[in-house]
């Protein structure tokens, strides 16, 4: 919550996966096709996973597009015999807060932003519900309300020692200018 922290290496590959099926993430369209992996993209995926796995004992990446490409990444982890290391941390945020952020940054209508949130969220939840990978669910709003508690639970899930002093480097309650969205009307197809 202090900045975006998207991993650019993974974001580029996620964009390539989506572009391969004619989807541009910057179009903000909510009808999103299932990505396909070409040999060239697969080689890039293998290379980046091997690079990070060799360089770091504990590593991961953050990119919202991974909600759409998670199945393709799991295939790579499986082929590299790294599937035992895979743990998913799914951080959700209220639909209206995401929509407000997209409106502020990209002048996207609120309803379109909420539909996009729904597409991303349904895709990743469907994946998590139909697979047995260890998954930790947390909310963006919860992290802002009690960062140390949420981060400690996340580190427990990762089976890694937690140093509470790192929280101040990564969590800034003022960074979220889109609010929590508690006062907004959400369309029925989003709230169901």
Predicted regions and their residues:
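Catalytic phosphate/metal-binding cores of nucleic-acid and nucleotide-processing enzymes, i.e., regions
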Residues: 57, 95-98, 111, 124
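Lumenal/extracellular "mature" regions of secretory-pathway glycan-modifying transferases
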Residues: 104-119
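Alpha-helical elements of Rossmann-like donor-binding domains used by nucleotide-donor carbohydrate transfer enzymes
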Residues: 44, 72, 119, 123, ...
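A structural motif corresponding to the C-terminal end of an alpha-helix
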Residues: 50-57, 123-136
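The conserved 3'-phosphoadenosine-5'-phosphosulfate
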Residues: 1-5, 90-96, 100, 129-191
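Conserved phosphate-donor/acceptor-positioning beta-strand/loop module used by diverse small-molecule
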Residues: 62-66, 81-103, 117
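Glycine-rich phosphate-binding loop used to anchor ATP phosphates in small-molecule kinases
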Residues: 37-75
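PAPS-dependent sulfotransferase catalytic core
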Residues: 1-43, 171-179
